[in-house]
């Protein structure tokens, strides 16, 4: 192919497309040199600790974990004994209850590495050459620009997991957001109670109650598994987890699938110990001791996220994932998942700004465009919210706004308010009775926020302070969505200033939440008209042919969760395409087959490439003539290779969502056959008709809008009344109390008929006893709700104790976390006491 490229005519065409010149081989210009990261200066604990100290970042004094001991699974999880006998659970579990302790260590892999670039993260040079070849073979007007963009992406980006320097610099940036020019503020400081935030969330994130069959929040996690060996009745109500993901502390190097039994044992132990502590003579002290004993459940592994980073920022920016301990993830998900699974309410099906559960396919994008055009016609402002993304339509201009390092803006009180919302609006029966007990209320409201917000993380053998919430925890989306809600509410209260004005940016200081304007799309009405009028009349979704359009359609670049809108003449509606920058980056750098189980199968790598090229076509490549032509050719070529090997392609492609980074967006689509126009029709055909005015109102506060609720809170007409839980629970309590009072009145001594003072005194004592019972009942009947509401209103967050380590040399001791030295660390008094108590409990079972 090199000879073809270097012919005088082709060489001139290629250089013209790339806007470059050379007297040598054209491939020297076409193909960028492979990126090799510089030597990482912070790849040792000593260097990292000194770097953090120099930048005044808090290093924690190392805390130890008891050494692992083997227990019989059926003894640790007696309810699941049958699963052990049937081989569904392993015979023994390893739990941290030894008589000595160890310091944990975690050294993540960073690829590509300075010393070994390897094949990981290599750019798709074959696709680049195919693009060049088809550029010469066809006369696509946008072809030169596409080739130039892909080549530029290869030259400036790099897929990989960054570096230690990038991770540490990211920590500093997160601290800068949390404590810098605009320090974080709690909702109370901004001026919101938890009930007021709940009222706002009823508009911005409407939720339903969990299914009736879902167990209440009253049980230890292992009780959510009903197993008898009968497939017709066996069922697990535990939240879904990705079994191939990291198990976190204390099981470093293992997956969730490896440690399911251990996670259940630890989660059970933690929630039970928490329950005992919460009902002890000194609940706060007891809870603190429990958290300290299980400190590792609030320490996440600082995992470098694989992304397409810019090469120039390789040592400056690596996104960190706070890999939560499996038991912590399990407990948090038990609170959120049953509610959110039943709450796919968003702007396309409900009168809410929320985009939760939104899919651009099956008419989703067209619904968004219909709502936008309706707002433009009525000259109304429009707002949409998804996690740390805010979208505002105002004065014919579309604004895409992101919270700056969104997770860093979070405080424990933000998460506490979200827990309050889930319990009072989700985990509550129609009669007002709570579906949770005091133990779970204590965990959700007082303990969980401190476990994942402003907690700690582990990198190398350094235990570090985490500023804001750990990214990737089970509440990341929910907490971010709450913070975006606060920003939008303050925007409404301020009179909806234009996002490009100082008045809008002043909301940062008011809310303690940093944000940035990612996109300003002016003249949106005219852009939409242009997209319709210039829509292609040939090719995919135009004339029904299985070819790309000669000239791509005009995209309405909303940046809506990474998607733009294209008008289809065939379907007479808008359909989604991936944002061009993201599409080009995906084409330039494949992520590779990350599913290790699939990777071991013969032909898996070839199947991955088929999936990759078909996915690129599906998410928007079909609208780019040159990219579509090259990707289609590559896909067909790889299919033939599998056929020659005698491998059935459908065996892989049925599970294609495990291979593609876009699998979650295209769930249910089969790639057993190459993409055709009919494929695009099928994936974009609406499931039902749509009228924006016919969307139902939010379930909890119908006939109210976000503007009305915000205005009511601001004006003082909103009095922060008791929630429905309180009112209905009060009614039930009064009914029970009145019964006792009636009994007391029946015993009331009658002076006209009773002369026996001893008898009268005895009856009076009975009456007083019943009245005391009534009074105690009035208090105890509200205990469950009061622990969830009253405690929250006092902003009480209970956290374990952690001490800063001022000497980085001590924190980075290379002996820490290695061999016999670490295992000879004595247990703390709390660890010793709890180990003895658990051993006694097991003997008594």
Curated annotation (Swiss-Prot):
It catalyses: RNA(n) + a ribonucleoside 5'-triphosphate = RNA(n+1) + diphosphate. Interacts with VP3 in the cytoplasm. It holds the Pfam family Birna_RdRp_palm. It is found in: Virion. The gene is VP1. This is RNA-directed RNA polymerase. RNA-dependent RNA polymerase which is found both free and covalently attached to the genomic RNA. May also contain guanylyl and methyl transferase activities. GTP binds at residues 248-255. It comes from the Viruses. Keywords: Covalent protein-RNA linkage, GTP-binding, Nucleotide-binding, Nucleotidyltransferase, Phosphoprotein, RNA-directed RNA polymerase, Transferase, Viral RNA replication, Virion. Residues 686-706, 799-845 are annotated as: Disordered. The lineage of its organism: Viruses, Riboviria, Orthornavirae, Birnaviridae, Aquabirnavirus.
